[in-house]
């Protein structure tokens, strides 16, 4: 029913899918001083994937599936259950804890736990992302980190339709829409939602809800450069990954912009009042 349900069920789905596909073994390049911890029957490395020296792959708690063209750089550690998509790169020293799914052509560094990254998402640098859902072409600046557990260990609430919704879960991170970008050092609260094409810069304790297409700079919401500039940026980013911007995508984005205009204006209005 809710996006956080995807995070809850993803580890068990990963295990079921591995059994269903029935693939195991190493077809790609596996360096002689990389290591497998646990049952090697729970590891599948597709042809064209490359595992560098000092990588540790741990299947103790679930299977690991590394797809064609993926590259795992030195000293990275990967825990199952985990899926790593085609041409995705896991950066040196990354700590990929259990329960993660990464789509195609992602760049993943730092620490990640029980999260879903859609294709072309970029988390190149250090920082923690846990129990989160990250959309396509999201770019997380260096040291961007989210909280996924409250200090009092109570259930995390998430804002939906302007009201807090009890998730029923102790661990809930962030839900970040396609093409949203964060600055270096951005710190997300537990249960944060950021919509489409947001531009978020670090500064103090951040809100738990970011309307789509809003900019958040110097601790306040603002309109930013407007939709046309956002679309041009998206086209540039997609072109760098050899993805074409489709007319259908632009239509959907423009419709979403109109649908979220009122909540965006309201957030900007409240920011102006509190900054006076």
Regions found by a protein language model. Give the residues of each.
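Terminal amphipathic alpha-helical/low-complexity segments used for targeting or macromolecular assembly
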Residues: 1-41, 48, 203-206, 212-276
